[in-house]
Amino acid sequence: MRWVIMKKLGKIWNYLSKPEIVPRIFSVFLALVFIFGLLMPHYLNPNQLYPKPIPHSQTLKTPLAPYDRGGIPLKEPAELKAQYPQYEPNLGKITAYLTPIAEWIKDKTYYFGTTIVSTPGGILDEILYYTRGMDTVLESSILLISFIIFSWLFFNKD
C-alpha cells in the first residue's frame, strides 16, 4: 500500500516538474487568486499610523494628493498615531520631504502627487498600503516566471 502511494506521488511530481506544465499550473493558481481577490470586500483600514483620507478627497485641494499626510515639516506636526510612545514629542514633524525641483513642480500643478517625481518611494508605498503583503506574492511570481523563461530557453536552445 505504501509503495503504491509513493509511486503515484512520484508520478505526480514528475508530471509537475515538466517546464511546459509549470506555467499552466501557475497561471491557473494566479487566476484563482485574482478571482478570489475580486470577490473579497475591499475597504480602507482606519487603524494606520498615517491616517488616510477617503480616496480622491484631496484631489484639486492639495498638489501633493494623494500623498499629503498633513502638517508643515518642522512647524506644524501631522496627525499621526504613535507606534512607540517615547517618540510622541517629535511625532509627525517630518512626514515627507521635497527637493527644490519637486517644490517647483508642486507650485505649478495640482497633479504633482501623481507624478513619478513626487516621492522616491511614493508609488510603491501606496501600492504596499493597499495590498498588504501582495508585494511578496508579486516578487515571488516575477522570480518564478523568470525561472520558467530561463528553463524554456535552456531546453529549447536548438
Swiss-Prot record:
The chain crosses the membrane at residues 25-45, 110-130, 136-156. It holds the Pfam family DUF2106. Keywords: Cell membrane, Membrane, Transmembrane, Transmembrane helix. It is found in: Cell membrane. InterPro entries: Prd_NiFe_hyd_3_EhaF (IPR011313). It is a multi-pass membrane protein. Its main location: membrane. GO terms for cellular component: plasma membrane. This is Uncharacterized protein MJ0524. It comes from Methanocaldococcus jannaschii (strain ATCC 43067 / DSM 2661 / JAL-1 / JCM 10045 / NBRC 100440) (Methanococcus jannaschii).
